[in-house]
Design a protein with these regions (language model features):
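Short, well-structured N-terminal submotif of metal-dependent ribonuclease cores
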Residues: 1-26, 39-51, 93, 102-106, ...
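Active-site neighborhoods of divalent-metal-dependent phosphate/nucleic-acid chemistry enzymes
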Residues: 44-46, 50, 55-103, 114-115
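A generic structural signal for short
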Residues: 1-2, 37-38, 74-75, 89
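Phosphate/NTP-binding elements of NTP-utilizing enzymes
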Residues: 34
Length: 115
């Protein structure tokens, strides 16, 4: 992320992403969602999304069968299938989810960005 993009995040979330001591993972579900948005003209990327994620030093977290199964069994607080996969990943992998989407709160996962 560049400085202007980090400034749009909450201060704690931006600081966590900028801190090189942290391992930052991007869900394969997020990459899929971004690719769909690019394909329909909602986002522009000058290079492949995976290459951009890796250039930032982030790791890609694959979606597993366990993630998908867990996502399918989640309560319907949030209906977006991509976000449900990300919630399941955060839960099963015991990761902190960086998000500014308040619809993630009812799932009891650790979040950063909703301060």
């Amino acid at each position: 992320m560049v400085g202007s993009e980090l400034r749009r995040l909450s201060r704690p979330l931006g600081a966590a992403i900028a801190d090189e001591a942290n391992d930052i993972f991007v869900s394969a579900a997020t990459i899929g969602e971004l690719a769909i948005k690019r394909a329909i003209g909602k986002l522009r990327f000058d290079r492949p999304i995976v290459a951009a994620v890796r250039a930032l030093g982030f790791e890609i977290l694959p979606v597993t069968g366990s993630h998908a199964e867990h996502a399918g069994g989640l309560p319907r607080h949030h209906n977006d299938p991509f976000d449900r996969l990300i919630i399941a990943q955060a839960y099963l992998e015991a990761m902190v989810l960086g998000t500014q989407d308040r619809r993630m709160q009812p799932y009891g996962i650790a979040t950063l960005g909703l301060e």
